[in-house]
Structure formats: structure tokens, C-alpha cells
Amino acid sequence: MAAAAVQGGRSGGSGGCSGAGGASNCGTGSGRSGLLDKWKIDDKPVKIDKWDGSAVKNSLDDSAKKVLLEKYKYVENFGLIDGRLTICTISCFFAIVALIWDYMHPFPESKPVLALCVISYFVMMGILTIYTSYKEKSIFLVAHRKDPTGMDPDDIWQLSSSLKRFDDKYTLKLTFISGRTKQQREAEFTKSIAKFFDHSGTLVMDAYEPEISRLHDSLAIERKIK
């Protein structure tokens, strides 16, 4: 039992911090842990099929969103998505009303209500098309930067992107809208997706994150100067 206790003590010592070298290793480990707790972008590497354009674009979009939300601590605003969901909900409401009314009042008695619901549904689909084309555009993130003093309105950061079919050029645009002056500034880059993915289809954040940070910092510097 004594030998087991000694052995256990040695195991516990090696698991903790043994000597100067152990103390150094312990400190490094806790520092790294603190960094990962602060910014967990690299926790789960993103791996996709490089030949699937939608998967490539979605993975790049999601990772760019994470940089703004996790690294810069901005707060996501879901207003654009809520608007689209509201339009879709109203459209579904007309479809459900038509279904229930036709069940309760079989055709042709239900004809006027069915006609109204069908017309209303297609009108809402038209509104949805206009909304996604001219309001949402290709924006996939709207984030707010709170004013530390609480005196000025929030600054708004928007991310939008494009990747044409059968093309390897990915364009990411970052838009800054000043909460105080309402002035709008933009910065963007266009790069080959091969720069951001390795041969197995894993997104290399060490190559992608600096590009996003460079866009952000260029607009943030202009903001401070003005």
C-alpha cells in the first residue's frame, strides 16, 4: 500500500507541475486554455466537399460570421431574417386558411375564399422575392457594435458574399455604417477558394481569418480617424 501511495504521488506530481520545467508547462497550458476559452473559432475544423459550391460558400460565410461575433464580440441582429420569416409565415397562413375553408365548405362553395387565398399567397411570394433581392441582397450577417459610453447609437457591420457557379473566386464584402453619422463605408476582397482550403477540403482558418481581420481593421481605422 505504501508503494502504491508513493506511485500515486509521483503520478499526481507529473500530472500537475513538477519543478521549474513543470511550472513553465503548467503556465503555458493555462494561458493557451484561456485563449481558447476567449475565442473558439478553431475548436472544430470545417471540412467540406471542395466541389460543392454551396458548401464552400456556406462554410466561408459561417467562418467569417464567427470572426466578427467571437473575435470582435459584436452582437448579431436578426432583423433581416425575422422579416423573411414573417413574410413566409403570412404566406403559409393563407395556404392553411384555404385548406381548412375548403374542408369545411367543399368546392364550389369555397371558390371565392380559395381564389382570395391563392392570389394572396402569390402576392406574398412576390413580396418575398423583392425582399430577398433588394433588402437582404447577399447579406448573411448584420451585427451591432455597442457604444461603450452608451451615448451614441450602435455602429452596424454587415457581411455579404458571392461565389458564382463553376467559379473559384470568392468575394467577401464588409460594410460599416456609423451609428452617429449614418455614413457607410465598404471594403472587400476577392480570392480563390484554393487559398483557404487544403487538399482534403478542410478550411484553414490561419489563412482565412487574417483576410477578414484586415478588412475589419481597415474600416475600423477609418472610423477612428473620422
Swiss-Prot record:
Its main location: endoplasmic reticulum. The modification N-acetylalanine is found at residue 2. One of its GO terms (biological process) is signal peptide processing. Residues 1-25 are annotated as: Disordered. It is a multi-pass membrane protein. Keywords: Acetylation, Endoplasmic reticulum, Membrane, Transmembrane, Transmembrane helix. GO terms for cellular component: endoplasmic reticulum membrane; signal peptidase complex. The chain crosses the membrane at residues 87-107, 112-132. It is found in: Endoplasmic reticulum membrane. The modification N6-acetyllysine is found at residues 169, 191. Residues 108-111 are lumenal. Residues 2-86, 133-226 are cytoplasmic. Residues 9-25 have a biased composition (Gly residues). InterPro entries: Spc2/SPCS2 (IPR009582). PANTHER family: MICROSOMAL SIGNAL PEPTIDASE 25 KDA SUBUNIT (PTHR13085), SIGNAL PEPTIDASE COMPLEX SUBUNIT 2 (PTHR13085:SF0). Component of the signal peptidase complex paralog A (SPC-A) composed of a catalytic subunit SEC11A and three accessory subunits SPCS1, SPCS2 and SPCS3. Component of the signal peptidase complex paralog C (SPC-C) composed of a catalytic subunit SEC11C and three accessory subunits SPCS1, SPCS2 and SPCS3. Within the complex, interacts with SEC11A or SEC11C and SPCS1. The complex induces a local thinning of the ER membrane which is used to measure the length of the signal peptide (SP) h-region of protein substrates. Belongs to the SPCS2 family. Component of the signal peptidase complex (SPC) which catalyzes the cleavage of N-terminal signal sequences from nascent proteins as they are translocated into the lumen of the endoplasmic reticulum. Enhances the enzymatic activity of SPC and facilitates the interactions between different components of the translocation site. This is Signal peptidase complex subunit 2. The gene is SPCS2.
